Amino acid sequence: AMCFGMPGIPCVYYGSEWGTRADKSQGDPALRPCFEQPEWNELSEFISKLAEAKKNSEALNYGSFRSVLLTNRQCIFERASGHERVMVAINADEAPFTAHFDAGCGMATDLITGQPHDFGGGSELPPYSAAFWKMER
């Protein structure tokens, strides 16, 4: 999720979209196994949604970057263009996290899930989760 939210072109290493694991100690060919027919899975679906959000968001493609909240396990940053603001929120912890910050608006839509998000009372991030909140203007 971080790669798709940050400025620049996201890079997904060959096989990562399928959740393939490899050991680098076995050499470079082990990192690029052949796929006869990869199986679409939960990770593939998530990466597909991230790519779709990036593709369709002016802010994620061309917007400025501003750090909003940073801990050892969570980060929230804003990408803003002339027409759009998106808050990228990531929780890399096994516990839920409630973030308190000034969003500058009351509601947003998560570009990953399509669900509305209410900033009132804090923003809860489930364990090991990400959200791309497109802010209402």
Residue spans for each PLM region:
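Carbohydrate-interacting/catalytic domains
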Residues: 4-137
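Active-site region of glycoside hydrolase catalytic domains
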Residues: 1
